[in-house]
Amino acid sequence: MATPGFSCLLLSTSEIDLPMKRRV
């Protein structure tokens, strides 16, 4: 199972990736 820190990092990456895709 992924650690809480990894899950938080993954979630943050997803939140950043979505806006970037919308800009493109």
From Swiss-Prot:
<dbReference type="GO" id="GO:1902109">
    <property type="term" value="P:negative regulation of mitochondrial membrane permeability involved in apoptotic process"/>
</dbReference>
<dbReference type="GO" id="GO:0048019">
    <property type="term" value="F:receptor antagonist activity"/>
</dbReference>
<dbReference type="GO" id="GO:1900118">
    <property type="term" value="P:negative regulation of execution phase of apoptosis"/>
</dbReference>
<protein>
    <recommendedName>
        <fullName>Humanin-like 5</fullName>
    </recommendedName>
</protein>
<comment type="similarity">
    <text>Belongs to the humanin family.</text>
</comment>
<dbReference type="InterPro" id="IPR028139">
    <property type="entry name" value="Humanin"/>
</dbReference>
<dbReference type="Pfam" id="PF15040">
    <property type="entry name" value="Humanin"/>
</dbReference>
<dbReference type="GO" id="GO:0005739">
    <property type="term" value="C:mitochondrion"/>
</dbReference>
<keyword id="KW-0964">Secreted</keyword>
<keyword id="KW-0963">Cytoplasm</keyword>
<dbReference type="GO" id="GO:0005576">
    <property type="term" value="C:extracellular region"/>
</dbReference>
<dbReference type="GO" id="GO:0072734">
    <property type="term" value="P:cellular response to staurosporine"/>
</dbReference>
<comment type="function">
    <text>Plays a role as a neuroprotective and antiapoptotic factor.</text>
</comment>
